[in-house]
Swiss-Prot record:
UniProt name for this protein: Tubulin beta chain
Annotated localization: Cytoplasm, Cytoskeleton
Magnesium listed as a keyword: yes
CDD domains reported for this sequence: beta_tubulin (cd02187)
Subunit structure: Dimer of alpha and beta chains. A typical microtubule is a hollow water-filled tube with an outer diameter of 25 nm and an inner diameter of 15 nM. Alpha-beta heterodimers associate head-to-tail to form protofilaments running lengthwise along the microtubule wall with the beta-tubulin subunit facing the microtubule plus end conferring a structural polarity. Microtubules usually have 13 protofilaments but different protofilament numbers can be found in some organisms and specialized cells.
Record's keyword terms, sorted: Cytoplasm, Cytoskeleton, GTP-binding, Magnesium, Metal-binding, Microtubule, Nucleotide-binding
Coiled-coil intervals: none
Signal peptide coordinates: none
Residues annotated for Mg(2+) binding in this entry: E69
Length: 445
């Protein structure tokens, strides 16, 4: 089996993570006590990817939960699936990181990281053939961003050949929690560029927009947002957990096909069909054409970046449900032909699709979309501008230098993010003719 160890850091990461476990436990027929109550062999066929079977036949998530304060852990434990997790895998401090990246990365987090790594090692050792790690965290706070990136770099040292995948919640342009979000985000991106293999970017504001516009909710709660994120996380990982016609694992399907240049591994995610919770009956009449159409719709993207402002380097569509491969291929070709200007022409076959036979609960079919679009630079550019505005005046810098950080680190992180933006821009503007010119120049020397 190709197992995945799932880590969740900080308040946001733990809330998204625990929602994700609720969704996939439900899909695999595992009840809140960890015993199997399902009705299909397909649920058990690859259940070991995320669950470890204990001696008594209970299924225990391969999950590592960490935070620098006990509050979130208590609420996860008290939640509906709190008894599912292995009690030793809750690792928490008492002090909190106070939205300070330096505390999470250098001081408080560094004290706790060894016990987290011990649990990760234990989980990795119980795997037959570890495929990689996934981390859910936010980049705006202190623990998820600082300690989350610390964990990634430590795991990178210890397991250099395993895939590292992150679900990263990026601060929104209009919805801001703390004033130092731009600092925390930039310092985190600086780490993710170097140490993660694929980062799925999620944005609260885009999630709010989906709730208002598409789902017609008047007062969306964080529960609703987490529900959306969990649906996408479940969709991204479904072809690893269930048998299907065109199946895949993290490395082949996602990392190899979606990352044309190693630094450009920040993806947008989308999901279809998105209908409000009440209108179940409408969902049954969906066709492959409908969901494909909806999937490429800018309103369904979970990031505050508009794919129409950029171009797709690569994309992957993960269909779920009973459908023919031929129909899927036709629809995907159809989309590419109609909107050819949005796809980069110098990467051949840059849209991949896979089909997993088992649809999510309550739907006949669904599709999850992962796109590597150059428009994600808008997000980095926005954070970069906020960062520069604060850093130029050295606002709040003493919080970080007081924890032993150096101003040089800020300058490095800033320039790394600016480089990332210009790399995206460069590939967005590149055309086939230019590629030809480069060859001629090389021959001339």
């Amino acid at each position: 089996m190709r197992e995945i160890v799932s880590c969740q850091a900080g308040q946001c990461g733990n809330q998204i993570g625990s929602k994700f476990w609720e969704v996939i436990a439900d899909e695999h027929g595992v009840d809140p006590t960890g015993s199997y109550q399902g009705d299909s062999d397909l649920q058990l066929e690859r259940i070991n990817v995320y669950f470890d079977e204990s001696a008594g036949g209970r299924y225990v998530p391969r999950a590592v939960l960490m935070d620098l304060e006990p509050g979130t852990m208590d609420s996860v434990r008290a939640g509906p699936y709190g008894q599912l997790f292995r009690p030793d895998n809750f690792i928490f401090g008492q002090s909190g990181a106070g939205n300070n990246w330096a505390k999470g990365h250098y001081t408080e987090g560094a004290e706790l990281i060894d016990s987290v790594l011990d649990v990760c090692r234990k989980e990795a050792e119980s795997c037959d053939c570890l495929q990689g790690f996934q981390l859910s965290h936010s980049l705006g706070g202190g623990t998820g961003s600082g300690m989350g990136t610390l964990l990634i770099s430590k795991l990178r040292e210890e397991y250099p050949d395993r895939i590292m995948m992150t679900f990263s919640v990026i601060p929104s342009p209009r919805v801001s929690d703390t004033v130092v979000e731009p600092y925390n985000t930039t310092l985190s991106v600086h780490q993710l560029v170097e140490n993660s293999d694929e980062s799925m970017c999620i944005d609260n504001e885009a999630l709010y927009d989906i709730c208002f516009r598409t789902l017609k909710l008047t007062t969306p709660t964080f529960g609703d947002l987490n529900h959306l994120v969990a649906a996408v996380m479940s969709g991204v990982t479904c072809c690893l957990r269930f048998p299907g016609q065109l199946n895949s694992d993290l490395r082949n399907r996602l990392a190899v096909n979606l990352v044309p240049f190693p630094r450009l591994h920040f993806f947008m995610m989308g999901f279809a069909p998105l209908t409000s919770r009440g209108s179940q009956e409408y969902r049954q009449g969906l066709s492959v054409a409908d969901v494909t159409q909806q999937m490429f719709d800018a309103k369904n993207m979970m990031q505050a970046a508009d794919p129409r402002h950029g171009r797709y380097l690569t994309a992957s569509a993960l269909f779920r449900g009973r459908m023919s491969t031929k129909e899927v291929d036709e629809q995907m070709l159809n989309v590419q032909n109609k909107n050819s200007s949005y796809f980069i022409e110098w990467i051949p076959n840059n849209i991949k699709s896979s089909i997993c036979d088992i649809p999510p609960k309550g739907l006949k079919m669904s599709v999850t979309f992962i796109g590597n679009n150059t428009c994600i630079q808008e997000m980095f550019r926005r954070v970069g501008e906020q960062f520069t505005g604060m850093f130029r005046r050295k606002r709040f810098l003493h919080w970080y230098t007081g924890e032993g950080m150096d101003e040089m680190e800020f300058t490095e992180a800033e320039s790394n993010m600016n480089d990332l933006v210009s790399e995206y821009q460069q590939y967005q503007d590149a055309t086939v003719e230019e590629e030809g010119e480069f060859d001629e120049e090389e021959e001339a020397y």
